[in-house]
Design a protein with these regions (language model features):
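STAS-like cytosolic regulatory interaction modules
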Residues: 1-52, 67-105
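ABC-family nucleotide-binding domains
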Residues: 55
């Protein structure tokens, strides 16, 4: 799961490409947490435009970063999930907990 983490104008954007699974979740989780704690952004955005697959580890990654963001006082949202990813998010009830948008970044 290649990913890019950008901090621009106090907005931390995590761009996920490929799969969010147990193989890559731990390393990415640590990297994102470090950035949230260091930068203290006003908003964290997970850009799922290029996310092709997500398992329960991916859901855990997202929900954990939502909680970490909340603890630091910053907003959290997901943008541009594809149909397969959105189906998993809906099945897990994530759309009731996290703002999900379709936008052009």
């Amino acid at each position: 799961m290649p990913s890019v983490i950008e901090n621009d104008n106090n907005i931390l954007t995590v761009k996920i490409s490929g799969d969010i699974d147990h193989h890559a979740s731990k390393e990415l989780r640590l990297e994102i947490d470090r950035e949230i704690m260091h930068a203290r952004p006003k908003q964290v955005i997970f850009d799922l435009t290029e996310c092709e697959f997500m398992d329960s580890s991916g859901l855990g990654l997202i929900l954990g970063r939502m909680r970490k963001s909340s603890e630091c006082g910053c907003d959290f949202k997901l943008v541009n999930p594809g149909a397969k990813t959105m189906r998993i998010l809906r099945m897990a009830g994530v759309e009731k907990l996290i703002k999900i948008e379709s936008v052009d970044l």
